């Protein structure tokens, strides 16, 4: 398994905006933008005199506006973007795209004569306008592959991009960890950027001669119209499990947001994993709800059986099935079999966990549909390589990333119930396959200002699967972190009490508020044969305490704690067998 490189360092909003933009954008006349909206079926009222020099950029953020930009003023949770229009205009914005409420705010600020495009749905219109300004839309940009689902988007995207490169395609990535356009990389702040930034990125990728780009598509991106004006050649679905209910309200609404990606107006072809995550319920429903033509994938004997799929839909048979799954080092070898023709693709994935087999299989099918069936033999050739080699051996920063041995130490982004179940199960399976016996320790918390109902559930999951549970802070955002920890601990302790009563097993539960101290505590408690899972933050390098960003990289902190353990063992003369090993990035 290859070692992941660290994500690029964080940038200021202005630096990131500059990194997104193409080097040159011809001016688009004001009437052309009004015409583009009309062609998209968006009613727009034009106010004020048209700017003489046209529009050369589009921005939703008044802090990063450049001369020649159209400023997009959207209604927000705390304030309307039009309240910041004066700042944008002072920076050189030549006009404003907003709604009726925004135009009224402009008038209140003495800006009634500013050129305005007034629409009802500002975010949808922003995508249409940005596509026209940056020359995107239609077939002018890179071929787009989308990936949506609760868990697995990042890993699937990284693996798909690696496959494309192996096939000689110049690829791009847009996702949670980073944004890459050819050789250029910038850190990411959103899983899916705003529509204005995405269309600038598509223009940048054209400049960088990117052939195909893989994009993570969050439910927020669909709901907030961040992907407006984009079209996907193929889009994939990983799974749907509890998360983001603070925004969506129910699993049904969450499902509907995800399903929006597979509207035929947005996507040419869909690849749906039927039995990912908690089982076939949502995958089967997504296959039926997708308006675009669908190819289906099932994990086969390692997951819900074809019979289980039939219970949800008697007429459903997966087009492709994962078969002949076997451990291969930390990862797995598997065969992807086409049900109708019997054609097989043999592959090896380096990441631990059966769920990463599902991610790898989905990546393979996305790439197959992107490059075309005529390239099936070439794809088979790059997949069928020895263990630890080839594109699917690629590691992903903070995704089941192994940072130490003796004890086994793994960092993962698992931050919801199913993600935690899968990460703990994967660690246990990999250790069992290697013949390692010992305890499992988990260190985790839960982010603030997010779905609160999942916190005690995650605590109970940790108590069921681990021997030592250390509850600590995650990024609390605006919440007091102590009640977050208490909520998790309530679920963990209730489950630990049940386990002690019914199974006679003791689960050790500790609370260590400081995350770095919690990591050191886990390393202190772990024996050489134990396994440590540090869950929740993955690749992230800062924690947000009510607006104060505190630097902390879980991978660095865990490596430092392990290195201190190695140094202490060497100094005490306890011998190399007890020193352990730190795996550097």
Residue spans for each PLM region:
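Acidic, Mg2+-coordinating active-site environments of NTP-dependent enzymes
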Residues: 104-106, 110, 234-408, 496-498, ...
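Short, basic phosphate-binding NTP loop
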Residues: 2-148, 156-168, 305-306, 346, ...
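Phosphate-binding loop of NTP-binding sites
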Residues: 125-274, 278-290, 365, 583
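Glycine/aspartate-rich loop-and-adjacent alpha/beta segment that forms the canonical ThDP
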Residues: 531-564
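Short, conserved loop/helix-junction motifs that constitute active-site signature segments
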Residues: 90-91, 108-111, 228-231, 261-266, ...
């Amino acid at each position: 398994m290859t070692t992941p490189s660290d994500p690029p360092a964080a940038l200021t909003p202005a630096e990131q905006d500059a990194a997104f933009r193409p080097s040159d954008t011809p001016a688009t006349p004001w009437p052309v933008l009004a015409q583009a909206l009309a062609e998209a079926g968006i009613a727009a009222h034009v106010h004020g005199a048209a700017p003489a020099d046209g529009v050369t950029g589009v921005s939703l953020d008044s802090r990063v506006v450049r001369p020649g930009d159209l400023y997009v003023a959207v209604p927000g949770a705390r304030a309307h973007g039009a309240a910041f229009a004066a700042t944008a205009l002072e920076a050189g914005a030549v006009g404003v795209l907003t709604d009726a409420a925004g135009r009224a705010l402009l008038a209140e600020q003495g800006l009634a004569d500013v050129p305005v495009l007034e629409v009802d749905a500002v975010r949808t219109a922003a995508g249409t306008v940005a596509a026209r300004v940056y020359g995107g839309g239609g077939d002018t940009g890179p071929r787009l592959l989308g990936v949506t689902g609760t868990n697995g988007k990042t890993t699937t995207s990284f693996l798909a991009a690696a496959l494309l490169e192996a096939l000689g395609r110049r690829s791009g990535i847009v996702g949670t960890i980073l944004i890459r356009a050819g050789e250029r990389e910038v850190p990411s702040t959103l899983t899916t950027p705003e529509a204005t930034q995405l269309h600038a990125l598509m223009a940048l990728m054209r400049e960088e001669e990117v052939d195909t780009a893989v994009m993570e598509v969050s439910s927020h991106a669909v709901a907030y119209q961040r992907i407006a004006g984009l079209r996907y050649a193929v889009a994939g679905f990983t799974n749907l499990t509890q998360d983001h209910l603070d925004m969506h309200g129910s699993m049904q609404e969450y499902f509907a947001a995800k399903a929006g990606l597979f509207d035929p107006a947005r996507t040419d072809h869909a690849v749906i994993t039927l039995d990912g995550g908690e089982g076939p319920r949502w995958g089967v429903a997504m296959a039926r709800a997708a308006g675009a033509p669908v190819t289906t994938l099932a994990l086969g004997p390692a997951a819900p059986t074809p019979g289980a799929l039939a219970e949800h839909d008697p007429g459903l048979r997966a087009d492709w099935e994962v078969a002949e799954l076997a451990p291969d080092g930390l990862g797995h070898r598997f065969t992807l079999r086409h049900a109708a023709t019997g054609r097989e693709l043999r592959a090896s994935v380096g990441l631990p966990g059966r769920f990463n087999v599902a991610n790898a299989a989905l990546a393979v099918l996305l790439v197959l549909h992107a490059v075309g069936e005529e390239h099936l033999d070439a794809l088979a050739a790059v997949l069928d390589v020895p263990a630890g080699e080839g594109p699917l051996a690629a590691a992903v920063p903070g995704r089941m990333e192994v940072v130490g041995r003796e004890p086994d130490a793994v960092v993962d982004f698992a931050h919801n119930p199913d993600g935690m179940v899968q990460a703990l199960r994967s660690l246990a399976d990999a250790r069992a396959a290697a013949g390692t016996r010992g305890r499992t320790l988990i260190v985790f918390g839960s982010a603030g200002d997010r779905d609160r109902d999942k916190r005690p559930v995650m605590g109970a999951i940790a108590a069921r699967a681990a021997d030592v549970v250390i509850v600590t802070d995650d990024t609390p955002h605006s919440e007091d972190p102590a009640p977050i920890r208490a909520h998790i601990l309530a679920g963990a302790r209730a489950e630990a009490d049940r386990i002690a009563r019914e199974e006679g097993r003791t689960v050790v539960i500790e609370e260590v508020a400081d995350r770095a101290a919690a990591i050191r505590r886990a390393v202190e408690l772990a024996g050489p044969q134990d396994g440590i899972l540090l869950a929740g933050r993955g690749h992230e390098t800062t924690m947000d305490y009510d607006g104060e960003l505190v630097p902390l990289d879980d991978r660095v902190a865990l490596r430092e704690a392990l290195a201190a353990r190695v140094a202490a063992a060497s100094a005490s003369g306890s011998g190399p067998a007890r020193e352990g090993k730190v795996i550097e990035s």
